[in-house]
Amino acid sequence: MLYRPKIYTNYNIINGGTKSRLSSACYPIQCAVVNSSNAIIDRRSANFEPSIWSFDYIQSLTSQYKGEPYTSRVKKLERDVKKILVEMENSLAQLELIDTLQRLGISYRFENEINSILNKKYVNINNPNYNLYAIALEFRLLRQHGYAVPQEIFNQLKNEIENIKKNINGNDIMGILALYEASFYEKKCESILKEARIFTTECLKNYTIMISEQKKLMIDNDYDYDIEVVNHALELPLHRRTTRTEAKWFIDAYAKKQDMNPMLLELAKLDFNIVQSTHHEDLKHIFRWWRHTKLGEKLNFARDRLMECFLWNIGIRFESKFSYFRTKTAKLFELVTFIDDIYDVYGTLDELELFTKAVERWDVKMINELPEYMKMPYLVLHNTINDMVFEVLRDQEISINIQYLKKTWVDMCKSFLQEAKWYYSGYTPTLEEYIENGWISVGAPVILVHAYFFHANNNRTITNTKEIFECLEYGYYPAIIRHSAIILRFTNDLATSSEELKRGDAPTSIQCYMQEKIVSEEEAREHIKFLINEAWKEMNNDVGLYPISLTEDATNFAKMGFFIYQHGDGHSSQDNQSKQKISSLIIEPIPLYT
């Protein structure tokens, strides 16, 4: 399925919307002088803080885990684990090992073996000896890897599930948790999985209450590890966590598990640290690029969030072999962020019209029509994308049409402009209008279309690029890009809505729905969460319809929305929590021995 972005050209005649009470007079104003006329222009200011991650600090990063003796040790551990995985006779134990490898972030080292095992599981899927835990685990792993497993496989467990409902205890909890995690692979119209999620969520919450009460009464229990993973799952299910972010948490949790395998733990820690050392080199590269542009130095009204932009990248593609991918897409993230701030907080409507026109023309001569402060961002955008096209043609040896890439920037700038028009006119769009514009303005189409062409040197088959993206010539995008973008748009809104209103941005989905339906903020937030679940169902349907690289990028991008915005605006904010996230994933290695 394909989707065309709707760009509203006359915001005064849109039906169904209302005027908001937003006023720029309520927000910080910054005065600027326009050289051509010496006129003073009142500009908004978001008062973004400078980046806390200095160039010198990034260039000084070092890691002891590069090279020997750690790489030799990892190769030995990898051989040993591979032997265990392949030679396992117990089918359930094999599934559990695959799940553990995934959560530890090292399954990519055993990709061929895991695919072979799961293919055999799929062929012999109806195992009469499996209980709820085994069937739910197998179902989740198979769906995760793109197998079309029917939800009806759970019908054989009706009696077992009913018994659990009547009398839940600690022995059942791993089965309930497995079913809970599996239920998030629900597609449209899958009522069995929908009911399973409701039932298991209630059971898991009751279980946490029961354990909490036992601890208050000082009753001994053996569920420390179980309760930790249950609480973690209730906070956010596995299907909404990226491999790298989950690995950082799970390595610590797995170390506390009574029956943990020391060999797996050592491999996971070493792998995490070795991969992290490649991230340091990626960071040094993109920080040198950013310093060379001097955008952050000369135009300090916009966010300088290169480290935060890089964080998105390791959620999408963390493995060492994707260094090329990360260094390219990190630049895209920063350019999207920077240009967003030009539209959101600094440019006048007339200036934004000029910038949008310049992007449409994609011609360096257009800088002569732009105000001084827009010339550098425009040239950096133009030159960076053109250089990327050249480098892909040179390094990747695949065909790339720059018109596809240009189209994404034009659409995004038009959507930014639309939001600016809504703001300056005091117009609050309907939720539908907001969504049709917002899934473009969130920047996901720009990132995902460009990113597709950065995979060819990673043994990823990049074929049928024209078949996949020629729809852009007609104004449409692949459905999986839209669904990923909608999830990202809503997770962003849930975290940043209040802050964006304070600095005078256009209304978010929450305010649009509140005003359209005359409901409270709490009700609006619940509705947005419902729409996120609906978009996930659609994206689950998309699996298998597109190349695996595009599917994985889009899915991981949506997952990173939860990670970045789970506790606030992790993209813009530089509070202690955001700093800790970055430090633990990118800067600090995991101690091998504790």
From Swiss-Prot:
The residues that hold Mg(2+) 1 are: D340, D344
Q: Does the keyword Metal-binding apply?
A: yes
Enzyme Commission no:
4.2.3.106, 4.2.3.228
Q: What class of enzyme is it?
A: lyase
Q: What's the catalysed reaction?
A: (2E)-geranyl diphosphate = (E)-beta-ocimene + diphosphate; (2E)-geranyl diphosphate = (Z)-beta-ocimene + diphosphate
Cofactor(s) demanded = Mg(2+); Mn(2+)
Residues that coordinate or bind (2E)-geranyl diphosphate: R303, D340, D344, R489, N492
What pathway annotation does it carry?
Secondary metabolite biosynthesis; terpenoid biosynthesis
UniProt family annotation: Belongs to the terpene synthase family. Tpsb subfamily.
List the protein's name.
Answer: (E)-beta-ocimene synthase TPS6FN
| Species the sequence originates in | Cannabis sativa
